[in-house]
């Protein structure tokens, strides 16, 4: 599924947005209520997850994941927190582009259970991050266009990106994705 999605976008880029949910049963119920196809599912004592069909959701494969305990992240292994280092402290938000961002915003809003949002800004607010739906700006079609990252040291990140040739029009760009630092 991911490979076909990236082919449609003509190259590298982000293909999945993972959202940790508090109540997996409720989240899965919203998916079923909205008649969205599931392309992958797992049901383990410590983790449950479903990947929603990207053709129906648009923009990315949406993964709804539940962890037990909530602070864990099975996919990263049991010791993942001891490997956190560097100037990035978290994900602030994600921009998803579309030729019809209003419709995509509404579809995602409904599947996510109508959390706090701004219809004027086409922005969905989650616990400590956001999803923003914007007009296709690069002609690659629907998909992840940018990540906004929480960072401790912008200078060191920008310096390293410049050394690696990852600056385009003054912005960090990696694999077809723009990275903003906040």
Where in this protein do the model-derived segments appear?
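Conserved donor-binding loop and adjoining core beta-sheet/short helix segment
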Residues: 1-4, 8, 181-182
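Short N-terminal edge-element motif at the start of the domain
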Residues: 5-13, 27-33
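Eukaryotic phosphotyrosine signaling hubs
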Residues: 10-16, 141-145
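Terminal peptide-recognition signature
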Residues: 17, 108, 147
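Short, surface-exposed ligand-recognition loops at beta-strand->loop->(often short) alpha-helix junctions
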Residues: 21-22, 94-103, 150-151
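Amphipathic alpha-helical segments
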Residues: 24-35, 100-115
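Vicinal oxygen chelate
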Residues: 28-93, 123-140, 148-149, 155-182
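A conserved mid-domain beta-alpha-beta active-site/ligand-binding segment of alpha/beta enzyme cores
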Residues: 90-97, 108
């Amino acid at each position: 599924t991911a490979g076909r999605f990236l082919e449609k976008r003509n190259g590298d880029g982000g293909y999945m947005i993972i959202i940790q949910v508090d109540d997996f049963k409720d989240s899965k119920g919203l998916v079923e209520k909205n008649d969205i196809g599931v392309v992958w599912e797992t049901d383990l004592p410590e983790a449950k997850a479903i990947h929603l069909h990207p053709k129906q959701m648009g923009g990315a494969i949406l993964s709804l994941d539940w962890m037990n305990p909530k602070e864990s992240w099975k996919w990263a292994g049991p010791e993942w927190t001891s490997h956190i280092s560097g100037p990035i402290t978290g994900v602030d938000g994600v921009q998803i582009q579309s030729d019809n961002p209003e419709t995509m915003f509404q579809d995602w809003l409904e599947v996510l259970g109508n959390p706090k949002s701004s219809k004027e800004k086409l922005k969905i607010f989650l616990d400590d991050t956001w999803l923003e739906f914007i007009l296709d700006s690069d002609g690659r079609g629907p998909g992840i266009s940018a990540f906004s990252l929480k960072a401790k040291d912008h200078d060191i990140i920008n310096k390293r990106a410049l050394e690696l040739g990852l600056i385009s029009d003054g912005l960090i760009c990696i694999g077809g994705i723009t990275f903003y630092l906040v």
